[in-house]
Regions:
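Short helix-capping/linker turns of helical repeat alpha-solenoids
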Residues: 1, 7-10, 26-33, 40, ...
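Amphipathic alpha-helical repeat scaffolds
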Residues: 5, 21-22, 38, 54
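Long C-terminal extensions of eukaryotic subunits of large macromolecular complexes
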Residues: 121-175
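Extracytoplasmic and endomembrane cell-envelope/extracellular-matrix remodeling and assembly machinery
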Residues: 86, 91-141
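Structural signature of tandem alpha-helical TPR/SEL1-like repeats
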Residues: 10-20, 43-52, 88-92
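TPR/TPR-like (Sel1-like) alpha-helical repeat modules
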Residues: 50-62, 69-106
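Acidic helix/loop microenvironments that form the catalytic cleft of cell-wall polysaccharide enzymes
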Residues: 67-73, 117-121
Length: 175
């Protein structure tokens, strides 16, 4: 991705830049997918752009999900920001909007959507039934951290001179 970014400043380096972005995108780099999709859209390669945004969304890029939501809303061809030559599809708009909200709410946790194809596959695939949940969230919620025993808390607190109930220092030091 970094090399592709550097090549964006080199005259006539566009083809190699897109190839670098595509390679990074296929390895799961969300910003590379977004940039690949954006450059493909400018070149009129709408199918490649659509696939790039899908990759970026799967990798956790919320803005790509938002772009797909807007693109499936059927903007006119003169709308250069969101036009991808797609037919209006209200259900896809809603699903991508839900994905955008999910990724935005969990961005600080590094959320991804590995089950994206089972939620909203690219056309011409028919939309499957969806229960409104995300695999990443289900896995995260099921992996509850182990609560340390009171004995361990006492031991560690004593080693550091902390109150085991509050985590604050036992003695206040004067400056």
């Amino acid at each position: 991705y970094y090399i592709g970014k550097l090549l964006s400043y080199v005259p006539n380096g566009g083809d190699i830049m897109r190839a670098m972005y595509k390679c990074a995108m296929e390895q799961g780099h969300p910003l590379a997918g977004r940039d690949y999709a954006s450059y493909s859209k400018v070149l009129g390669l709408y199918q490649e752009s659509l696939e790039g945004y899908q990759y970026a969304t799967r990798s956790g890029n919320a803005n790509s999900a938002r772009n797909l939501s807007k693109s499936f809303n059927g903007p006119i061809a003169s709308d250069r920001l969101y036009y991808l030559s797609l037919q209006r599809d209200v259900e896809r708009v809603e699903r991508y909007h839900e994905i955008y909200n999910f990724l935005t709410r969990h961005e600080h946790l590094g959320a991804k959507v590995p089950d994206l194809e089972s939620i909203v596959p690219l056309p011409p695939a028919v939309l499957p039934e969806w229960d409104g949940t995300f695999q990443w969230k289900r896995e995260r919620d099921s992996a509850v951290p182990v609560i340390p025993s009171p004995e361990l808390i006492e031991k560690l607190s004593a080693e550091k001179g902390l109150d085991p109930s509050t985590g604050l220092p036992l003695t206040v030091r004067k400056p």
